[in-house]
Amino acid sequence: VDLFRSMDIPVRTIECCSGDLADLKVKSYDVEAWSPRQKKYFEVGSCSNLGDAQARRLKIRVKGKDGNKYFAHTLNNTVVAPPRMLIAFLENNLNADGSVNIPKALQPYMGGKEKLIPLD
């Protein structure tokens, strides 16, 4: 979420309904970015807690402080789906003249430029 916000992309997290969860998921959140073109949010990533279900299948155990072995709890995350990130970035930073605003977080990597200007 912070990555998207640092790129001046409006973003939100949505807790998924239990009826929408895949087989192993205990809890899941979707990360959604605002699309000015579509005038709605669209999914750009997700974060899911699989409890110990995946670890049971893979026989992944951890030793607890009490010395007993337990099945690990696992997470499944899509931090960034690059094509969706690019779409969200361009849609939220594009100007009417075709130039693209460079967020402050990226300006040091762009030689201090504040905008990308299209070539004629």
Task: Indicate where each model-derived feature is located.
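TRNA-recognition modules of translation machinery and tRNA-sensing kinases, especially anticodon-binding
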Residues: 1-120
